[in-house]
C-alpha cells in the first residue's frame, strides 16, 4: 500500500497521496544526507553536466550554462563539491590530463573590492595539476620562484605577482584550457600583501594593495585553513575568507599557496603532504600547483 496512488470506487479513481508532500519529504531526506556527508568531508560531489543535463541543452555547453546561472544568482541545486571535468590537451608547458574542477565557494567575495565584485563561483581542482616543459622540475612539479626570496621589488612589491607560479598560471595554464572554459572565467582582483623595503629584506609585510591576479590564481592560506598559520594576519590576510570546500583538509597532497611566510625573508606557504599548513623555500622542487578560477 505504500506505493498506492489511487483507489477505485465504482469505476471512479480517487487520489490517496499528496505527491507534493512526498516530493518535499524526499528532497528533505536528500538534503539531510548531503549535509551529513558534507559535515564529515565525505560528500563525493556530482557531475553537474549529468545532474543538469536537460537544462544545459538550452546552452552551448556546461560552462555557458554555469556562467548564466551565476550571473542570475541562481544557485538552486548546486552544491559545494559538485564538479565539472575539464580535459586539457598537452601543450608546451602543461601535461595532458583531465582536471576535475569542483565548486569550492559560492559568492565568497560578492560586493567586495575597490570595485564591487559581481556574483561568482570559485572553481577549485580536486587535486594538483601536472606541469611540463621549461618550468617543470622533477618531471611535473614547479618551483614557486627560482630564487630563495619571498620579497617584492621596487617595481612590483607583491611577491606572488613576481612568482614563476603566477606566471605559469596565467601565461601557460590559462591558454591550455578549452575555449568554453576560458569564456566563462571572471578575472580576480584581491587585496594582496606587499613586502618590500629599499633598506633590506623583510620578514613582515610592508603593506597591501588592490591587485589583479588575472584569470588563474593560487589559493591563499586563509582560503584553505580559515586562518594565518605561517602567513601574517592583517596585511597577509587581505579580504580573504575560508572556502567551504576546505572545512575538511583530508587530502594528503602537496601544493603551493600564494601566501608568503611571516617569519622568514625567503619561505613561502604551501599545503603539506600530511594535510597540514606548511612552508618551503620557493625553490623547493617537489610541489605542484592547484590553479583556481572564478566563473561569473
Task: Provide a role label for each language-model segment.
Residues 1-33:
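Short, low-complexity N-terminal tether/leader segments at secretion or assembly junctions of large
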Residues 36-296:
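Collagenous Gly-X-Y triple-helix signature in extracellular proteins
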Amino acid at each position: 500500500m505504500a506505493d498506492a496512488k489511487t483507489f477505485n470506487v465504482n469505476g471512479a479513481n480517487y487520489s490517496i497521496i499528496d505527491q507534493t508532500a512526498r516530493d518535499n519529504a524526499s528532497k528533505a531526506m536528500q538534503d539531510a544526507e548531503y549535509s551529513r556527508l558534507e559535515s564529515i568531508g565525505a560528500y563525493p560531489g556530482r557531475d553537474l553536466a549529468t545532474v543538469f543535463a536537460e537544462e544545459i541543452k538550452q546552452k552551448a555547453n556546461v560552462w555557458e550554462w554555469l556562467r548564466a546561472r551565476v550571473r542570475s544568482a541562481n544557485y538552486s541545486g548546486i552544491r559545494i563539491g559538485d564538479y565539472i571535468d575539464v580535459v586539457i590537451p598537452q601543450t608546451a608547458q602543461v601535461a595532458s590530463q583531465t582536471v576535475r574542477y569542483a565548486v569550492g565557494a559560492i559568492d565568497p567575495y560578492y560586493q567586495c573590492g575597490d570595485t564591487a565584485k559581481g556574483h561568482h563561483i570559485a572553481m577549485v581542482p580536486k587535486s594538483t595539476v601536472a606541469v611540463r616543459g621549461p618550468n617543470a622540475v622533477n618531471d611535473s612539479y614547479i618551483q614557486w620562484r627560482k630564487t630563495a626570496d619571498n620579497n617584492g621589488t621596487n617595481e612590483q612589491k607583491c611577491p606572488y605577482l613576481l612568482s614563476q607560479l603566477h606566471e605559469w598560471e596565467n601565461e601557460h595554464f590559462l591558454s591550455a584550457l578549452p575555449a568554453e572554459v576560458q569564456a566563462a572565467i571572471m578575472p580576480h582582483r584581491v587585496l594582496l600583501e606587499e613586502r618590500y623595503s629599499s633598506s633590506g629584506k623583510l620578514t613582515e609585510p610592508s603593506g597591501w594593495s588592490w591587485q589583479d591576479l588575472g584569470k588563474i590564481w593560487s589559493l591563499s592560506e586563509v582560503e584553505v585553513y580559515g586562518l594565518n598559520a605561517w602567513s601574517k594576519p592583517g596585511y597577509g590576510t587581505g579580504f580573504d575568507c575560508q572556502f567551504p570546500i576546505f572545512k575538511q583538509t583530508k587530502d594528503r597532497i602537496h601544493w603551493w599557496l600564494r601566501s608568503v611566510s611571516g617569519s622568514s625573508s625567503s619561505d613561502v606557504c604551501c599545503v603539506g603532504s600530511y594535510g597540514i599548513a606548511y612552508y618551503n623555500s620557493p625553490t623547493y622542487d617537489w610541489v605542484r600547483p592547484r590553479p583556481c578560477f572564478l566563473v561569473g
